[in-house]
């Protein structure tokens, strides 16, 4: 058997008839399957034991030889070899066809490969193959031409006229004859000659033919093998037949299809033996051809063959295609043992790295480990009795189970796994009941809630797997989100509310202004009711265990609240004491205004101070990020647990509730509405008098109601009590937002109708008063639209992620430094005057390409190839530098991946990226995962003269698929000055641009909004009108880098507009994959075919060789491919076939005799090899063996002692 981890490549090609026979273990001659009386396979039938192997292990068909001792014996009575029944999954058979049959993939695919080789149209081929016309195979001395089509009548006429002077035939036989006569060398040379002069359609056809000819020539495939003489029969276990209750059988469709082929083949043999008339034989041959077509690809030609209930039968091609096909169902997504799933419930008392595993589940998952331990401890004599003990649930197994699961991490996964944080490792603790307990802080990463979600558990078995799970995947390690490097484990809901309540300040609370000597005294006073959590008090600063206070401050009093004293106990001692939610306090120190001398009148001082805001969700996130930066993983995860516990505790103590009394009504609401009604009335009057158009009226009415709603909202906020539970919930960021509150207590406002147009009748009621019937009806549109939109969006976003993963799955960090001398110059991304992504954020975690100096002092801020940290990035921006050249994935020279320097920092860990990191997949997940948060609709920019601007998910798809954008901007092909803008015919505008040596004019439709005016200086490729630039047009007038920069900025605009932050490097990795190919224009003296799409690296390599040998290099132009197209154009046919268009990819690969070098992840997963990323990459695999050798020696020594 082949060792799965030990082969280098996989090759695919056409099989010759001899090859098919050499695979086969015998010919299938009968269409029978199983004898229905004995339930044994029929001899020479589709399940024959003599051909395919025995049904039962080590037992021949007739029962003469049983038991393993006869291994390898071939029974003399029934001819079955005594072996394992598993061989029925791998032994193939064959059918000797009575007449050659064409393979539908090569004849019917687009373009028809057979047609290109023979230089015939697919239409003509079809007539020949299905016996409608004759084709001349040998014209002899007659005036007929080779490959000329003859109808039945013409054939008879010529036969009478020339007798046997020529030969013509029908069906696949004739095709085979023509194919075997083709001289590939001669044809190739002729085509190359033709290319030198041919133009237009002829040239295109010649190039396509040349491509196929070269493929056949180079791969060693013979064109005549596209016609089958022998048909392989796949192993019976792969097309099984199973008995259902009631004695009926269920069988795979393939058996029906094979049966049809065998029946027709046998009938044809009989007809030929009988010497039947030609017309009957021809009809039977046609039927055989159709049967084989249906078997290979049912439904590709004509009506599909149907089974019971008019259901088309699934052919061999269908077995590979689609989500249920072999590739995606069984090779890329396998079900695994040692796994289980159950409902999740919250485990608030768990540590960050723990999860609760139900006892029954743990016992089943760790069964083998428990059995081994039971035998090891002598509690069971052998494995069998250990198993019995477990099944009986003997009491002693629980102690053993506890021991076994200690420090054995398990993986928890929640579907849909949108990013790598969808699978994390935890240490299991046993819990009663049947639900998995999940730590509340990891819910954000999993996007889990406890309304019935389920999660799956997997057990890593080997020592290496456990080590990887513990070191790389433990939940306590996954604090940062890979997409932007911000903490993903921020407290939510109750935890936020608790910490918000804890850090609130209240005027004149109980015991305000009391002075305490230390925290304990303050807490004691709080517990006895002398002070409140919210009371502002003074504490002797020296008693607080904080290392950041200065000596002077230690001798002073610190003005704070009891709640803040408690809150600060969860932070590390060397972290600033947090007294106010400001950046200064977080990053530098506690502001000195909170320290007063011991002689101060504390009460008067406090009374004069403003109240400080409590700590909201965002601040808690910033605290976590700061702690992570300064103290790293372990300390942060401990601090998070303390924050969680404190939040829950205080939240419980505060006893927040929501009642109808908390929803206050607004006195002024009636007035505001009256005023609005009056204004609307005036607007309507103006419209009736014809002073404004209907559109203007509509826009103004909507503006009036929006203003009214905003006014009510503003007044509501002012009238709210800061301690109102609903206000606290939304202000802290625990749940809800201000618009929810406005709808409860103010007015609901305007709603959209099903088409998305805003209904101008506002809903003036709120939920506390209740809606009228009409208002309720108007509201239902919006509610339904929301739900349907979400459902559609999820599917779209998932498909986008799938395409992104596919195009970038082989991008891995391959080396430390690629040594490139190019870089990417970056500045802040802007939309008009608004900054979308500041320079600071773009710089952090990247390597500088050139030395960066301060523009005035000339002092070096960062050297060439230095990592730009947050501090350096701030320095650069403060020095007033606006653009910086950095190393980027765009300019990286690494083949099949990126190097460490061009990629920069790994956002998920905050440290340098490791060689072997699968950055392509991380990039795809980072862009795809927030996809569900993007909006679906195409926005209408208000006003009459507005183009539709696509935003949200559709815009992201438009960019990555490189489609022509909606609302396309007109770009200039020359750089220079706009000399005139004139109005032309049909109210069009004509813009004229004077370049240095060229003058161009552009006609602009009158609906477009201009971005330039007379005298503006424009560069080549700059947009003249508002809208999106078509990147394909941009690549024609500018260089690749400009297109890459443009795409990067556009993607960032969409995500940032929706408030989603994504690291630039992820977008860079994806965009780079779209621009990997080059289209060859002139081949020079190389042996590349013109018009070929090839990888830039391969192209450069071929040119280097040409230049070194002194010949003419090829020229090409870079091509921008959409992600779907780029995935299908990858060098790996396994990866492409498992993505989309399976049959087309495989047909192409087989003709070219392609080799899959197994560089990406997908192809290795398909073959069951270790993926070449992470610890599976070459350099780490070599390490392993050496380490193992050492440990082996050590163990020997131990045993000797």
Swiss-Prot record:
According to its UniProt entry, what is the function of this protein?
Answer: DNA-dependent RNA polymerase catalyzes the transcription of DNA into RNA using the four ribonucleoside triphosphates as substrates.
Q: Which cofactor does it need?
A: Mg(2+); Zn(2+)
Q: Subunit arrangement?
A: The RNAP catalytic core consists of 2 alpha, 1 beta, 1 beta' and 1 omega subunit. When a sigma factor is associated with the core the holoenzyme is formed, which can initiate transcription.
User: What is the gene name?
Assistant: rpoC
- Keywords recorded for this protein, A-Z: DNA-directed RNA polymerase, Magnesium, Metal-binding, Nucleotidyltransferase, Transcription, Transferase, Zinc
The family database entries (PANTHER family) matched by this protein are listed as: DNA-DIRECTED RNA POLYMERASE (PTHR19376), DNA-DIRECTED RNA POLYMERASE SUBUNIT BETA (PTHR19376:SF54)
What Pfam families does UniProt report for this protein, alphabetically? RNA_pol_Rpb1_1, RNA_pol_Rpb1_2, RNA_pol_Rpb1_3, RNA_pol_Rpb1_4, RNA_pol_Rpb1_5
Q: What class of enzyme is it?
A: transferase
Where on this chain does Mg(2+) bind?
449, 451, 453
Gene Ontology MF term list? DNA binding; DNA-directed RNA polymerase activity; magnesium ion binding; zinc ion binding
Spell out the InterPro entries in the cross-references: DNA-dir_RpoC_beta_prime (IPR045867), DNA-dir_RpoC_beta_prime_bact (IPR012754), RNA_pol_asu (IPR000722), RNA_pol_N (IPR006592), RNA_pol_Rpb1_1 (IPR007080), RNA_pol_Rpb1_3 (IPR007066), RNA_pol_Rpb1_3_sf (IPR042102), RNA_pol_Rpb1_4 (IPR007083)
Specify which residues bind Zn(2+) 2 according to the UniProt entry for this protein.
818, 892, 899, 902
CDD domains cross-referenced by the UniProt entry: RNAP_beta'_C, RNAP_beta'_N
Designated name of the protein: DNA-directed RNA polymerase subunit beta'
Please name the NCBIfam families in this protein's record: rpoC_TIGR
What EC number(s) has UniProt assigned to this enzyme?
Answer: 2.7.7.6
Binding-site list for Zn(2+) 1: 60, 62, 75, 78
Matching entries from SUPFAM superfamilies are given as: beta and beta-prime subunits of DNA dependent RNA-polymerase (SSF64484)
The record's comment on cofactor binding reads: Binds 1 Mg(2+) ion per subunit.
Picking any one GO biological process from the record gives: DNA-templated transcription
Native organism is Listeria welshimeri serovar 6b (strain ATCC 35897 / DSM 20650 / CCUG 15529 / CIP 8149 / NCTC 11857 / SLCC 5334 / V8)
UniProt similarity note: Belongs to the RNA polymerase beta' chain family.
Q: Which GO terms describe its cellular component?
A: DNA-directed RNA polymerase complex
**Reaction catalysis annotation:** RNA(n) + a ribonucleoside 5'-triphosphate = RNA(n+1) + diphosphate
